[in-house]
Each structure stands twice: as structure tokens, then as C-alpha cells.
Amino acid sequence: MKNPTRAVSAAIVAVMLLWGSAVAAEDKAPIKIGFSMELTGPFAVVGKTGLLAFKIWEEEVNAKGGLLGRPVKLVYYDDQSNPANVPGIYTKLIDIDKVDLLISSYGTNLVAPAIPVAISHDRLFFGLFALAANEKFHYPKYFSMLPFGPEPVKTFAAGYFDLAAKQNPKPKTVAIVATDAEFQHKAAESAREHARRTGIKVVYDRAYPPNTVDFSPIIHAVQAAQPEMVYIASYPSDTVGILRAIGEIGLSTKMLGGGLAGLQAAAIKMQLGAAANGIVNVDLWEPVPTMRFPGVMDFIKKYQARAPAEGVDLLGYFLPPFAYSELQVLEQAVAATKTLDNGKLAEYMHSHPFQTIEGNIAFGPDGEWTEARPIWVQYHDIKGHDVEQFRDPKTVTILAPEKYKTGDVIYPYSKARGE
């Protein structure tokens, strides 16, 4: 029988050692990780979820004694969802705040303006959900937390058109609708490429201004073209406006969706309710058994426990696991190299895989993932606006890829909507 006094003593020693390492870390200058984030403006509904994920990582690492024996500290500013604010923020982070590491806010349109600043200061920069942001620069110290693989633009719309091509009869025509902004331009480019590849004729192809609030004229114009499928690349706020307009006006088409940003977040689905039914869209992660990578559900539990008080998306299935994984990568790279030298960290990140709550990740040319892993989903049976119906996958089916598939597409769009 074990000596209970000895066991208690050992436990006390373990606690004291952990406390001692935390205190020792606090006595040293913090390692500063700097970024901008959409805390206000149209992208805040997603951006603030990323900030909570960053905070959870920061607290966990500091509780373990920090990095290199030093505490970590997040240094961030609200970019107000405005790309014009980004360069000034990153210049301040580097020149005034003297941050050690740079990460980004959410999305291509807010990441791209920061890259020239990082390049001019020769700093490592980690982009969060930025589609092919480095394709113009080929900057060796840029890394992407977005699972679209080494050819992200080519991959982005591929699954949507692959699904369409398998239907019987296959749709013959497509309308492409996109916001006039960098991410959506790339998504539309991908859609055009795969329309050609699958022999589907483009009968409508227009971009609308980012400040559009009335989408009725766009939906009427699309309907006039009579496309058998519609591919949309939009901002999160636009996604709500577009789908509400479709719900009010009606749209006769066999397949609808593609690149509706924000629809992956519970907060957006809660706004839309049944208007999301039938949509086939790109997604990145769902809590299905095949995607429960080690540690991810523990993180989700922590996130969801704090989400109500933080006033953010209640489920956190979209951006948060990837935001947390991004910092896991930096944590592992710093721990392995025992340095904050951005050049040495970049070399290590290009040559080693990383274990994260989003699975194993490795980086190739331009800092993109070596393996593409987007998923394609369809929403269905959504009733009302209660969040509980989105907590497990009962209102979403993973259609592709095969390794994550949970069911088949309901086709055409009218059938999926129960019409």
C-alpha cells in the first residue's frame, strides 16, 4: 500500500515546481506576439472568435511557464475590418511595440496588406485564413493557416464543381457572383477554372461593390440568366444579405453555394435559420468522428465555456481551432529551436511537421499546407434560430472528401429546401 503522506508531499512538490516556473517566467520580459484583429466592423463576428482562441492559448502556455522561460503576451489592435488600417498597425507593432512574432487577423483581405510590412522588416508572418496571399511575393518567411494545400486558388472551388459534375443530369450552366475584393476575386477565378474543366458554361459573371446592402437587383439579374447552378463568393455580412434576398425573391437553380464566407459560423447560421437549407458550401472542420483530431474537442469545450461571457460565436467550429493551431505551431517551433530569430524559425517551420488540434500540418512553398484538406458540406433541416441544432452535425452533411464524408448531396436545391 502506498504511503499517503508521501503521495501528498509529492503532489505539493509538483504544484510548487509548476508555480515556481510560472513565477520565474513572470520575472522576465515577455515574448510579444503582435497582430491586428477585426474587433469591430462587418468581420468582427468571426474575428473576435479568433481572439478568444489566441487568449486561451496564451493562458495555457503561461500556466506552464511560458516559452523559453518567459511569459507570452498578446499585443493587438482593432483593425475595424478595414484593410487600410492594417499597414499602420503592423508598422507600430514592429517599430513601437517591438513584438517578437507576427500573426494576422482573419481573412485574405486583411492579411494581404500586412505582408509588405513584414517583408520590409524581414519578419516571419503567419496568415490566418488568407487564400494564396503569398502568391505575388513568394516570401519565404510567410506561413498560411488555411487547409487548401500547395495550390490554394486551384483547390478552392474544385469540390463544388466535382459534386455538380456527378449529378444526373449534370448542370450545364453556372452563374458566378462575387464581392469586388481580393479573396472573392480568387474564389471566382477558381470557379471559372473548374467550370471550364467540367464543361459547365458560365452564363453570368459579375462582381458587386463591397458596400452593397441591397442584393435584390443582383438576384434578379442572376435569375434572368437562368443558370442551373450558382457559385457565390461573399463576405460574411454579404452572405446573410444574399441568402435573405434569395429567400424573399426566390431563385430557380439546381445547386447554390460555393464560397459563402461566414456560413460556417454558428452566429451566421443562427441569423439565417431555414434560409441556409440546401446550400452546398466549402467548410474546414466539423465535429464529426473522422475530424476529432487529438485535443480539438478539449479546446472546443474550453472555448464554448467562455463564449457567452465574451459575446462571441457560441460554438467556435470555424476559425477558433485554426487560430489556436497557428499558435501551437509557433510554440513548437520556438521550443524546438530555442530562439526567437525569425529566420531560424522560418527554416524550421519549412522543414518540420507540427502536431496541432487540427491534425498534423506541414508547410511547403509559399508557406501553404503541403496537403489540401477542405471539406464540402450541405445544410439541411434547419428550423428556427436556436443554436442547439448546430451543436452536432445533424443539420450539416459532409459531402466530400471521401475520408470525411457523412452522407450524399440532396439534389436539386429545391428538394434540399423541402419545396
Where are these regions (language model features)?
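Short, charged, surface-exposed loops that flank catalytic or proteolytic processing sites
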Residues: 335-347
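Extracytoplasmic "Venus flytrap"
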Residues: 31-55, 77-84, 106-107, 177-186, ...
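Signal peptide-proximal N-terminal region
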Residues: 26-28, 52-74, 165-169, 196-199
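Short, low-complexity disordered leader/linker segments with a strong preference
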Residues: 1-32, 413-419
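Extracellular/periplasmic periplasmic-binding protein-like sensory domains
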Residues: 147, 246-324, 335, 390-393, ...
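Solvent-exposed, acidic/polar segments of extracytosolic/periplasmic ligand-binding ectodomains
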Residues: 31, 350-419
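Extracytoplasmic ligand/sensor domains, especially the bilobed periplasmic-binding protein
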Residues: 99-205, 254-281
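Beta-alpha junction/loop-to-helix N-cap segments that form part of ligand/metal-binding clefts
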Residues: 32, 45-52, 65-137, 145, ...
